[in-house]
Every structure is written in C-alpha cells, then in structure tokens.
C-alpha cells in the first residue's frame, strides 16, 4: 500500500510512549560504581576507603581508595543490589544502600562526609542512580525480574525486540513464541543484518559461518540467565562492529542452594481465528496457527565446596509446532506428483539444552568460571516454510549433539589492576536429511506454472547435505583504574572453519509444466566446500578520563582478518572425474585502524542530566564465508540445465525418470525413446570441469590497510532524570558506509546489449495506476561467459549508503517494582547507486536502470515499543503488558517476462531465460502496519522460602490480522496475503522459585 505520511502516526507514537510503554532495559558482563567524595565544605577527600558489598559478590566486599581528586571507581561488579561504605579517620562513616547495578552501567554515587568518628555510621537509603554520566554507550538490560514478569516466550530475541531502536529481521513477527527459535537478525540504526552478535560473557557463541546474524546452532537456556544485555550504540574500542551485541550473563552458584522450575504450555484449541473474509477472498484459505508450544526449564545451583567451588546448572526442553498457511499434507510422498489432503502441514521445531556453570574462587585474587552447554536441535520443515514448497521437499534439519565450552578467569590483582582472560569453543554439526517416506531415488520436482495456492516444489529436496563448523575465540585484557582514569587494553581472537556438502537425490532435479516435462538440472556431485577463517583479531586500548564534569571516552582498535580456501580433493561422481583444487590464500587479508571517541557532560553536576556525543569507525563483520566467492569449487560449473521435453503435440507417457528417457552422461542432445521425449544438449560444456574462476576480486579490495567494508557512526544524545526513578532520553544517530564494492563483467560493453521497454498494465494497485512504458531495460545480444571483477565503487565515483534516525525513550522504575517505559524510533536508510546504471558492464540486478530504482529514499516511519508491569500488593498479583507498532513489509512486484511482452520493443527473443523484473521502485510501497499487544497476569503463592507463581498470558490481545508476507509475483494474485499475524492465543505457565 502506498506510504502515507501523516501526523497521526506520530501523535499515536507519542501517546503510546507516554501512556503505555520498553523499559527496565538499561553491556559488559559487569557494572561499576564511581563517584567523588567531599567534605561538607565541598573540598575533595583523598584516601577515603570505599567498600562495595553485595550478595552478588562471591568475595562479599570489593575495596578501593579515593585518589587525589577524591574520585573512586569500583569495577567488575556483577549485577545485583549493592551497599557502599565510605570511611576516613576523623569523619563519620557513610553507608549508601539500595544501589541497583546492571551490566555495563556505571552508577554515579557521590558522597559528603562530615567530621566525626569512624564509629558513627550514617546510613543513607536513596534512589538508585539511573543516569550514566560516564559512558556514551546505549545499553538495554533484561534483568531476571523483567524476564520473569513480561509476557514473552523467554527467547532473548523477544526481549531485544522490546528495545525501541532494535528491529528483528529474518523472521516474521513473533507472537508469544509462535515463530520457532531459529536464526534471527537484530538490526539497529541501519546496521547490517548479519552483523548482530550473540555472546556469553562477552565471547561469541555463533557458528563459524555466521558473522552474528542467523545464529543457527546455539540457543540460549533462559533459566540460567542472570540477565541479558543489549548494547546498541556508541560502542567503545572493545567492540569490532557497530551493531546489536546481545550478551548472556549466566547465574553463579552460591553457598545457598537455590533454583527455579519453569513450565509453559499452549494448545491448538486455545487460539482464536483472525482470518478475515477479505483475506479468504484474496486466496488465503488458512492461516498459520499453533498446534502446541511448550517450555520445561528446571535449574538449580549451590555449593560443591563451601566458599570455594559452586555450580549452577539446568535443563531446558522447548519447542513449537505450527501449521503452515495454505500448506496441506501430501497423500503419498512416493507418488511423482503432489496430491493434497485437507490436513495442514506442521512445522515442528524443538531444542534441548543441558547446561552447567562452575565457579571456583581459588583465592581472594583469582576467580575461574567454566560454562558448558550441550544441545540438540530439530527442524522438521523448511526454515521458513510456505505453501510454495511441499513438506516432502524440505529436509529434516538436525543438530548432532553439540556444545559450547567456555572458560574465564578474573583477578583483581590490586584495587587498581584487574586482569581478565577467557576462551570459547563451539563445534556445530547441522545436517539436512531426507524425511521418512522420501526415498533416495525420488527426484526433486518444480512447476512454476502451478495454480495459485499450490506448491511449486515437491518430491525430494535439493538441500540435503552435511554442515560442520568449528569456532573458537579467546580474549584477554588488563584494566588499570584510578579515580580519574579507567585504562583498559586487550585483544580478541577468533578462528573458524567449515566443511559442507550438497547431496541432491539422483544428482538431478526436474522441472515440469503441469504434467509435461520441461527441463532438468544435473549436479556435479559430490559438491563440497572447505573454507577457514585463519584469524579475526582485534587489539584495543582505551581510557575513560573524568575531568571536572566531563568524562572523555577515547580509544583505538587494530583489526586484522585473514581467510583462506583450503586444499580440496573431491572424488569422482556420476558426471564428473576426481578433482583437486589448490588452496587459495589471503581472501581476504584486511588490516584496519579504528578510532573511537566520546564525551559525556554532567550538565549540572548533580548526576541527573548527561549530554553525550560520540563518533567511531567500525568494520563490517566477516567469517569464513568471505572466502566462498574465491573457492574454485564455487566457481566451477556445478549445475547445468538441459531441456527434457516431448516433441510439440506429444503427451508424455513416461515414468518421469530422465535416466530412462535419455543418456544423461552424454552432453549432446539424445534420446532413448525417439518420438516420445528428447533431452537437449547441456547448456554449458564446462559442466563438472575445473575452470577458471568467473568472479575475482581486485587485489586492492581484499588486501591491505583500510579496504575492509566499514561504517562510521556518530551520535548525540541527552538523558535526564525527570523525577527519581524516571528518566527521558533523546538521540540523533547517523551512520555512513564505506569501502562499498561494485562488480564489473570485463567481457562485455554497452554495445553488447539491446535496450528495450515493456508495457506496464493498467492496474490501480500499481504506482500511478500503471498504464505506462517502463524503459531502462537491457538484454545481452549473445551468450557471453562472464569474467566478473569485484572492485571498489570509489573507483567510479562511489555508492552512497547513509542512515539517519531519531530516538525518544522514557524509562520508569517506580516504587513496588512498577515498570513503565517505552520508546519511539524514526529512521531511514538512503541508498544511491546510480553510478552503476549507465555502464552496462556493471552488475545492477534485473531492476530497470532508471533514477527511481537507483536513488532509494524511503520515508521516515515510526517504530513504537512499550511495556508495563504493575504489581497489586494486596493480592500479590502482577499485571504486565507489552506493545509494538511496526512499519509493514516493503512491497515489490516481480513481473515475469516473456518474449510476447518484451519482443515488440526488443525486436527479437530474449537471449537467455526471460527475467523477472521488479516494477515497483524500492522504498515506495509498504504493507499494513503491524500492531501487537500481549498481556499477562500472575499470582504469587508463598510457602516458607518457596514462591509458586502461576501465570496466564494472552498474545495478540486484540486479535489483529495484519498481513506479514505477500505474494510478490505480479499478476492477478499479486499482493494476496500468504501469511498473517498469528491469531490471539493464550497459555498457562508456572514458575517455582526456591
């Protein structure tokens, strides 16, 4: 639907911000308490002993002394509630209680001491600081309390989604856990979707293939979480990328046995129906619905050796079975063709985790942690199943039991020097198997002419194969902390490798039109790939310097990344001889210097108003997959198409096995059944051969200093404590990308193409109602073997890619644990690659080469988030709700071309396969906005030291039905809904804390 720019949406956004609103979200593994100590005359006091104590500290107390400016800084404090005592001979002792500390937050605690004796103690219970006047970073924290009270599925992405500036991509809107926990991307302020990073205690747990997003393989055991933090902006020199860092901080055991048991269940009969008559009329006969959702998560911890060795461990089994919209079970997998029943297909996904964390306090100065998580995962359908692919054509994906093994050490050598180190190993095996009922001899079938609402793919899958990746990473740092300076230096090092295969049945797949054979694809099996990330290393040094009311955060980071393609030996296959491929080194070999700078001004000196500014250079994430384009196996001709069709006017009467119809080992045209069927010559004679790479990198973009894709991020913000426990935040963020590349086919020039136009049908659904000529289209005059070169777009003038955005947040943590918070983000990413459109040797996709397709300026669209939790103390009942209002999906119109459509202007048939052309410029049409409100009520039942908390939750409270995905193929069914928001459903749960 065309974009509507109205004031109404903005007014609604502000209303939600004020009256409903994400919060309790305030990275790092630990926090800090810092401040200045003065006497009652205002003079600073050096030499004051400052002690921070909390049950969260295994050693119970952490001690520092104020410096010559009266400043102190206590670092490496685990999340929890702290008391801070200030003592100096000749002065009364002051004890400040009730300081709530979250990871990555610096609580500013200033104190005045009056003359007296140490024995005199003045206890102050004030409001906990909520404005960080020292760090420029924007942090959000999902504490244990927040995770337990809000109506969510306990997936860390669900908590990230409640942060106003964060956008979840890669999946549809998740209603109460109805979207299976699979690979998900978190985006903030125009960051790359694949850059988001998931860590446990600051160390990545992604598989070796992911750069952060699409984190297949490891799924977090929520019961072990003390809190989860999300860092979104103004990252210091410790961080490689400017993205969302999701950091999982596990619980630690203590001298007291404690734990919890959580359970949750939702069934198919607990869901309403939100499919409208209009959506049914548009062809959506059924929606996605839940079949069952469950989560079982007991955990417990305590001492093994009191005051020395502790453990905290747990088990979790959770999953989702959903029906797939418009997708119905096949009556017989073994039949050549798809025969739907009236029973909807299910998408079963489940995970299992057994995790334990061991903590050793070897002595007062040395603490060790060992974290291990053994997991098993099952995906019983396609990752994102739709009716277009029958379930038989989806592999069963299984993770062979795999694990995370992580160790860490910390040592506060003195009250000024802190040493830390750690390492993580994450082997992952993730394979695609044939599902029961699909035989090894069955072919993968495709029919692009299938009627609307019917699958285009059935039979077997072409996605079978083996995937193994190993990722290891290490970190070490040293921090030197005085009252005025906090200096930190260290490094992070990552290695990764992958081996994966492609194993389609019969080394062939078939295409039909109805029941008539059309073409087939042969595969050069076995197909396998080996790549290695030799190292991704960052070395950093930074300082946080407090001077008067200013805090300067400055640092520099050196990034080094090197990947290679390993030597590969592939045995002979049905169509190919044995092959050997030499190693390919330094693809890429990048080196970067990345400066970071930020400043915080405590505007009035009272710790309640902070004006902040920051700017930094960040590299774009990469892993071994960066080497894939340089892999000679990738550039080999691994698939080839040939016609497989009966002569004109002949009805096919074979068994749909092309091996019986033709000699597929003969590359020339041939048949075994003259007059009945004919196989054409293979379209590429180089099929299965070791060939020169058709895509190469300009050495200038893969080797050297400062050639890695990067982005600069700048931000200015202000945070103000309005009243105690209530703060407001506003920010402007700008991100601009650098070292963007372009691809040139060096074997073609403009003279090798013919320009043509196509008539756009008159259609009120199209921009301006259609009925015009779309020009700027080109078809190559002859088949030309590509010789692609990837080079810096700056060589031809550059591609512009810039994000601008505004954030407005309110956070309130009121008395009696009332949470009321929310935020609005307005942003857009502008891209101009018009430098590519006039040179036809430059890759541009199949979009028209006109200004409205290359200069993309979408509108600002508000993203609104809110949450509230309100305990009713008289009945020990808690009410909570969350709200999200998100922009609808961007729409496109992929218009299938034919010689009949393009021929009159082109003057000849297409040289190759007719393309699909997008006839709606990007950023001009969007679907319906998505509104989602979730609600929970819980009741605490207390008996002795045990609290039993049953819950009742309702998701999509108002049963909204916005369309989440549309049919994007232009035609009569264009814009018909394929998936709508999950209908309202409810679940029951219980949590027992002991």
Locate predicted features.
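Transmembrane beta-barrel wall of Gram-negative outer-membrane proteins
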Residues: 258, 288-378, 400-423, 595
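Transmembrane beta-barrel strands of outer-membrane/channel proteins
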Residues: 126, 261-267, 313-317, 370-374, ...
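Periplasm-facing N-terminal accessory domains of Gram-negative outer-membrane beta-barrel systems
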Residues: 2-143
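C-terminal beta-signal and adjacent terminal beta-strands/loops
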Residues: 621, 725, 739, 746, ...
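Gram-negative outer-membrane beta-barrel transporters
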Residues: 561, 729-892
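Solvent-exposed loop/turn elements at secondary-structure boundaries
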Residues: 156, 166-169, 567-594, 598-794, ...
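Periplasmic N-terminal accessory/gating domains of Gram-negative outer-membrane beta-barrel systems
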Residues: 67, 91-252, 271, 278-285, ...
